[in-house]
């Protein structure tokens, strides 16, 4: 991984208990940042796999500390504005500032649009889209008040570029929404020297994906490739990307190297969208 200089900075990472969020937290620390590691630490009714736990969040904290950086762990649901506001306030109280917001928290479930119940739709949209807005709102307010710029990076998806007829209507809608929100926030916050971007992964080897496979079977990935004109990875068909591949993009977009990059959604998809 290239070297970045986040010395003296503070990164606020959501969904940090495992998967991509843990990877992001660890690498922000590796490059010199202190970390606010946030996760929900309880399950959601319509999600068919276990979400991050308190023990996993503590393990992430240990990884950050092993890199020689300070860490604050917070349990919060990104879909709850009061909890988000309190988490941001506690982070600023602890470290004095936030420099980078990593909007990584997300969930997945599956049902055809005409059969999906409202609770499943609401829980996913509330986490994957509303949660990105709420965290961006409250950290964005801090950036404006502080007057020293900032970075917001959010996890979109290749599902934000196309329709997917595999019980993913809510997920597709949310990720399209993240792309639109990213562009709008970039325009609104440019005058405050805040860069706002997103990353669009394809299939990543994380607890979320393995949880979906366990809940719905291997065919959920096989059918995905068939419905979407080929494999998720054109270099190594059948192989998923690793969390660190997405972290690479997060680090770049959070760094001064991407000073004049804003409003984009960067695919890290092993050629998936090229087809």
Regions found by a protein language model. Give the residues of each.
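Conserved glycine-rich Rossmann-like NAD(P)H-binding loop of the short-chain dehydrogenase/reductase
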Residues: 31-59
């Amino acid at each position: 991984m290239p070297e970045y200089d986040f010395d003296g900075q503070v990164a606020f990472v959501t969904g940090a208990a495992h998967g991509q969020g843990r990877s992001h937290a660890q690498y922000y620390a590796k490059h010199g940042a202190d970390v606010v590691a946030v996760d929900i630490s309880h399950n959601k009714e319509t999600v068919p796999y276990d979400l991050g736990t308190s023990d996993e969040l503590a393990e992430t904290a240990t990884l950050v500390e092993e890199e020689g950086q300070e860490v604050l762990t917070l349990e919060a649901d990104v879909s709850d504005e009061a909890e988000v506001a309190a988490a941001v306030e506690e982070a600023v109280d602890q470290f004095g500032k936030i420099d980078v917001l990593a909007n990584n928290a997300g969930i997945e479930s599956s049902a055809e649009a005409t059969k999906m119940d409202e609770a499943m739709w609401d829980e996913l949209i509330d986490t994957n889209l509303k949660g990105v807005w709420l965290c961006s709102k409250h950290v964005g307010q801090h950036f404006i008040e502080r007057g020293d710029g900032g970075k917001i990076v959010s996890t979109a998806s290749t599902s934000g570029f196309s329709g997917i007829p595999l019980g993913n209507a809510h997920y597709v809608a949310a990720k399209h929404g993240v792309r639109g929100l990213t562009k709008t926030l970039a325009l609104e916050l440019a005058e405050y020297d805040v860069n706002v971007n997103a990353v669009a992964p394809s299939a990543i080897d994380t607890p979320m994906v393995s949880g979906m496979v366990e809940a719905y079977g291997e065919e959920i990935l096989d059918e995905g490739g068939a419905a979407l004109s080929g494999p998720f990875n054109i270099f190594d068909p059948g192989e998923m990307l690793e969390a660190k591949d997405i972290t690479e993009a997060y680090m770049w977009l959070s760094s001064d190297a991407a000073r004049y990059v804003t409003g984009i959604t960067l695919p890290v998809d092993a050629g998936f969208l090229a087809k």
